[in-house]
Regions:
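SAM-dependent methyltransferase catalytic-core segment centered on the flexible catalytic loop
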Residues: 52, 88-108, 119, 141-184
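A generic structural signal for alpha->beta connector loops
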Residues: 80, 106, 134-136
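Short linear functional motifs in flexible/disordered or boundary regions
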Residues: 82, 134, 168-170
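S-adenosyl-L-methionine
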Residues: 124-147
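Class I S-adenosyl-L-methionine
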Residues: 1-103, 110-125, 129
Length: 184
């Protein structure tokens, strides 16, 4: 399995270098050119690995297998639901959430990210994905850790930027109320 990932990572790095994908405009052009030619998960991986600010923004992206494990461990929800994705990044959780809840009458998803460029790229990707009619997405270019929420949510799911949380009490609260798939 490591060999496959290593080969995949080498391919991703070659693509990033070949298309100069550390540049925002080049990423947009890449999405427009290759959206129908490459697997969507592969494009998302390319966006994740080409983010030059990932260290600064504590942008550590979640592998799709972990996202799937987390989604498989959430409770069954019915009716109209509201979901918060506090650190959406390039949308790997978001796309899986949309699929998982496509059968419900109404799904309202609020997504947050501090990276303006990654949100713009995510919006471009979502224009190319046929979203179910039941799904509405609101984008917030804000740090959810300092945002004052007016709504409650049925589900909060994602991989928040724990590296940014310096206060141990706050970090412990997030860990206490979250799901850790390693010890469920």
């Amino acid at each position: 399995e490591d060999i496959g990932f290593k080969d995949n990572l080498q391919s991703i790095n070659k693509i990033i270098k070949l298309h100069n994908l550390t540049n925002f405009k080049n990423k947009k052009a890449f999405i427009n050119k290759f959206y129908n030619k490459l697997d969507l998960d592969f494009i998302i991986k390319i966006l994740e690995f080409s983010n030059p600010d990932k260290e600064k923004n504590s942008s550590y992206f979640t592998d799709s297998s972990i996202s799937i494990d987390i989604l498989n461990n959430i409770p069954i929800l019915k009716g109209n639901i509201r979901i918060l994705e506090p650190s959406v990044g390039s949308g790997s959780f978001l796309l899986q959430l949309i699929k998982k809840f496509s059968h419900l009458p109404s799904v309202q998803i609020d997504v947050f990210d501090i990276d303006t460029e990654i949100l713009s790229l995510l919006k471009l990707l979502l224009k190319k994905v046929k979203l179910p009619k039941n799904t509405n997405i609101n984008f917030f270019n804000k740090d959810f850790l300092s945002y004052t929420f007016k709504n409650s949510y049925d589900l909060v799911i994602g991989n928040p930027p724990f590296g940014k949380i310096k206060d141990k009490k706050t970090l412990n609260e997030y860990k206490k109320h979250g799901i850790n798939i390693n010890n469920n």
